Swiss-Prot record:
Pfam families assigned to the protein according to its UniProt record, in alphabetical order: Exonuc_VII_L, tRNA_anti_2
CDD domains xref list: ExoVII_LU_OBF
Protein name: Exodeoxyribonuclease 7 large subunit
The family this protein is said to belong to: Belongs to the XseA family.
Coiled-coil portions: none
Enzyme Commission designation: 3.1.11.6
Molecular function via GO: exodeoxyribonuclease VII activity; nucleic acid binding
Record has Signal as a keyword: no
Length: 446
């Protein structure tokens, strides 16, 4: 008989079906220690372990957002969910939808964690607390419309300060919807903006009943409020995170109303006392001023009032004279300045400057003409002198006096030693030349 081999996918799918259909694996309750936990923005993946085994855990974001504490590595927890097989890796895991600390109540654990977180952020710092309005006109009350809280606040406010207007903003103060209801009402009051004080609270109850006032969203809404908030949650021994974040904490609703309002009758008494004090102070001041006035009126200055202005009149005359002289000096200086400007303007007049430049040019032309004429005459005189000297040295001038010169073979004969008997020579005279032959040579002894 041949064996049938399954694919990995087929086997995994078969096991996944078994896990899904097994009624014991559809709802499993486990206790274990958190391991490999790292907070993610979407779904959470971590492990649960004990001394002998480890199982992978997945928790969808919708379920994780409902837990009341911050999971930490090493924390022992109680979880519930269903066992599943992840086919791609072949690993089984538990997909949980609830988780709470094991050994310590989940709400107390969540409370301590959130208090620590908000304290580090500074939401409890005193410098962030807003002062209450001493004489409020409108007070917003965020609480349940039924119950002793709203009745106590109304009774106390009307007894102490009936001129204040109370406006109820009904809110759910217990259960899963309470936190969102409280946050919505806080935002609504701030958006309307015409309130001086907010009172938020509820009566006593268990930690579960009071838990909406320990939610982080409620704490941040109170911290973000632009209007001062008085928190009054539970009994005097109960301290919620809303109490820690609020600007003022009241132990009871009655105490909240007392903190929010003064006693009108006491304020009226104070006003009357202030009025009497002001009247007395004014009377004293009037009396003092009257004494001063009487003293001034009886002074010798006021008895002879002309003394008050004699010196000022003299100073005024002096100032007028100085002013007149200063004005004359100013006019004189301005006239001189004007004359100087007119002179400069006349000197720099374009037509005058053009005329002056034309005259200068004409003078330069005349000087140049005279200079050139002088140079020409001088050169003419020197030329005549040179011509006369040259004429005196001219051979024609010499021959005119009876002299002649001899050429032999085209060369001038300067010495008798250059000639020989029978040499043919040419004699040049003033008016012509003659051919001759040397017949005899006589050389004179020196």
């Amino acid at each position: 008989m041949s064996k049938e081999y399954l694919t990995v996918s087929a086997l995994t799918k078969y096991l996944h079906t078994k896990f899904t259909r097994d009624p014991y694996l559809r709802r499993v309750y486990l206790t274990g220690e958190i391991s490999n936990f790292r907070r993610r923005a979407t779904h959470q993946y971590f492990s649960l372990k004990d001394d002998n085994a480890v199982i992978s855990v997945m928790m969808f974001q919708s379920a994780f957002s409902k837990i009341k504490f911050e999971p930490e590595k090493g924390m022992k927890v109680l979880v519930s969910g269903r066992v599943d097989l992840y086919e791609k890796s072949g690993r089984y895991q538990i997909i949980i939808d609830t988780m709470q600390p094991d050994g310590v109540g989940a709400l107390y654990q969540a409370y301590e964690q959130l208090v620590k977180k908000l304290r580090i952020e500074g939401l409890f710092n005193e410098e962030l607390k807003k002062p209450l309005v001493k004489y409020p006109k409108r007070i917003a009350v965020i609480t349940s419309p039924s119950g002793a809280v709203i009745r106590d606040i109304i009774t106390t406010t009307h007894r102490r300060y009936p001129i204040a207007q109370l406006v109820l903003f009904p809110a759910v103060v217990q259960g899963d919807d309470a936190a969102d209801s409280l946050v919505g009402r806080l935002k609504q009051v701030n958006e309307e903006g015409n309130f001086d004080t907010i009172i938020i609270g509820r009566g006593g109850g268990s930690i579960e009943d009071l838990w909406p006032f320990n939610e982080e969203k409620v704490a941040r809404a109170i911290s973000d409020s632009k209007i001062p908030v008085i928190s009054s949650v539970g009994h005097e021994t109960d301290t919620t995170i809303a109490d820690l974040v609020a600007d003022v904490r009241a132990a009871t609703p009655t105490a909240a109303a007392e903190l929010a309002t003064p006693v009108l009758s006491e304020e009226i008494v104070k006003i009357k006392q202030y009025r009497l004090r002001i009247i007395q102070v004014l009377k004293n001041k009037i009396s003092n001023y009257q004494q001063i006035l009487d003293k001034v009126c009886s002074s010798y200055i006021l008895q002879q009032p002309d003394r008050l202005y004699t010196g000022y009149a003299q100073n005024l005359d002096s100032l007028i004279n100085r002013k007149n002289q200063a004005f004359k000096n100013l006019v004189y200086q301005n006239e001189k300045q004007l004359q100087l400007l007119e002179s400069n303007l006349q000197h720099n007049n374009p037509s005058i400057r053009i005329k002056d430049e034309k005259n200068n040019l004409q003078q330069l032309l005349e000087k140049m003409h005279l200079g050139m004429l002088g140079v020409f005459n001088d050169k003419s005189y020197k030329l005549e002198k040179l011509m006369s000297s040259l004429d005196m040295l001219s051979p024609l001038k010499v021959m005119n006096r009876g002299y002649s010169y001899i050429l032999k073979d085209g060369k001038t004969v300067k010495n008798v030693k250059s000639l020989q008997p029978n040499d043919d020579v040419t004699l040049y005279f003033e008016n012509g030349s003659a051919e001759a032959r040397i017949t005899k040579i006589r050389e004179e002894k020196e």
